Amino acid sequence: MNRYNDKQRIRDLYDRTSPYYQSLWGAHIHHGYWISGEETKETAQNQLIEHVASAAGLGPGCKILDVGCGFGGSSIYLAKKYGAEATGITISPIQVEMARKAAAAEGVSAKFLLMDAEEMKFEQTFDVVWSVESISHYPQKEKFFAAAAQCLEPGGTLAITDWFKKERLAEREYEKFIRPIEKGMLVALDVMEDYMALLRSNSLQIVHNEILNKNCSKSWDLGLDILKNRALWQIAAEYGVEFLDFLRAFRSMRAGYASGNFIYGLLVAKRI
């Protein structure tokens, strides 16, 4: 664990910021995936879900565990589009409340639970464990991968997108491009190979490995537009330095993409 990805700090940050983030960013708290480059943010975010679902071989009516579910956007989308039996977990009580309200408003029966991803246990197993932009927050990622493997049916799928740093990153590049992201977003960035090793050590066979930078970097062009909202900075000042660091990290994310030092990756693995 670095000094940024502390669970209590992460919980507090999302409890404070989620209502504002939703009002600015929409139903989904993740990147968009642009194909033509002309799509709206909302369309691009749905296209990311579809891209991950396709890579994971998602079928109708499957049982999905959405780990780090945010305000429930992906779970609700998958329940409506694929008839998925979706269960979402998050460590933020505010996000659980927001997700339940969103599901009720959409007439979706997805379940949302307050649960630590490193300690998750269920009586049932799932066809798919789905984790979009969440694992980089976890202090002990090895515990998540072990728990995720146990949550899967034999032959089940773990589908991950997450934030990574470039391999063999020089210290100067780390300090300039990666540390501000870790500080503002409360994450610890690994290289993709670290996740691959954890997948293999938990009897999860990698079937898809992809870098999505080309299609997803536009998310942070839009992020910079969000920063032009003066009211947001006034709110941030009221909430303190961590919210300010969070907003400043939007620029760092864009710089990380532009420099090639930040990687947005997709991994899909099957339980052997």
Q: What are the language-model segments listed below?
A:
Residues 118-129:
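A short acidic, Gly/Pro-enriched loop at the edge of an enzyme's catalytic core
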Residues 187-203, 209:
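Short alpha-helix
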Residues 65, 74-119:
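Class I SAM-dependent methyltransferase SAM/SAH-binding core
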Residues 28, 39-60:
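Conserved alpha-helix/loop element of class I SAM-dependent methyltransferases that forms part
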Residues 142-157:
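A short glycine-rich, Lys/Arg-flanked "PGG" loop and its adjoining helix->strand segment in the class I
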Residues 1-23:
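N-terminal auxiliary segments of SAM/dcSAM-dependent transferases
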Residues 208-272:
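Conserved Class I S-adenosyl-L-methionine
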Residues 164-186:
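Short, glycine-/aromatic-enriched active-site segment of Class I SAM-dependent methyltransferases
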